[in-house]
Amino acid sequence: MLWVIDGLVYGFFTAIYTLFNQHYKLNGYVLGIWRGFGISLAFMPFLYFFPVPESAYYWFLLIFQGLLIGVYDSHLFFASADFGAGPTSRFMAITALVTTFLWWFLTPEQFEHLLGNGTVVISLILVLFGFTVSYWQMVQSPVSQKLVRYILPAVFALAGMSIATKEIAVHSQSGVWGAIIYYLVVALFVSGCYNLFFYFRTQKKHGFKQFVADVFNRRTVWPGIYMVAFSAALITAKTLALRVAPNPGYVTALLLVAPIFVYVLN
């Protein structure tokens, strides 16, 4: 059950992650650039200690994961700045449900096995009812409706990330630590490229000089360094948990503690 502890650590760092841009209110793409390229460069030397993956499927997972991270990061950073960390983290909790059902769709034999247990079926019905009521309450205000429309891509991105992370950890040729290093270097580099592309796409009037000023000004550098540090811890805890958890949705469900941490830390 060590994955439960790792999952709770994941929830704690997710709370910090969500609170971050509520405080700094930086451009979400700029933070994504820092997180992506910063982590990738910091951990690149460790690639020397692990063999290069030979599986094309494994490289596809890493690249696909990077694109999902780019979607998730940018939406989460902008949402926490515009709507606050509390509402954002509470709505992201619905990812647990999406991840669980997506995993069962991909592994129907596990779902069929669970259906043989009446207690589990009743529990699922109660969970579905609870999520439905919570979702209905969240979307009653105009602010929540705007948040839902904006953050929904991040919900599906995080669900996909959770499943891809488990696959990356399970199919690693060099153990879980090799999986973590390749995740930190390759997937995060791809996410940095994603955010770089959308930065220039949305800031068309900005040239290279303005880009350098936005990324390396005093107001951005220290938050960027902090982001690199605790994001690496978040990814490590998440990968360790997802590798052994029977369903990625169970680990994502531990993100339900994130709104509590947000409330305490806010």
Where are the language model's segments positioned?
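Hydrophobic core positions of alpha-helical segments in small-molecule transporters
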Residues: 33-35, 64, 91-94, 122, ...
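Hydrophobic transmembrane alpha-helices of multi-pass small-molecule transporters
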Residues: 18, 40-47, 73, 97-104, ...
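Specific transmembrane alpha-helical segments of multi-pass solute transporters/efflux pumps
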Residues: 44-92, 98-102, 157-164, 221-247
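Glycine-/small-residue-enriched transmembrane alpha-helix faces in small-molecule transporters
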Residues: 1-30, 67, 71, 75, ...
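Membrane-interface helix termini and inter-helical loops of multi-pass transporters
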Residues: 48-57, 107-116, 164-180, 206-214, ...
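Hydrophobic transmembrane alpha-helices of multi-pass small-molecule transport proteins
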Residues: 38-43, 94, 98-105, 114-137
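C-terminal ends of transmembrane helices
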Residues: 14-26, 70-89, 131-143, 196-210, ...
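C-terminal transmembrane-helix exit sites in multi-pass transporters
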Residues: 50, 95-120, 240, 244, ...
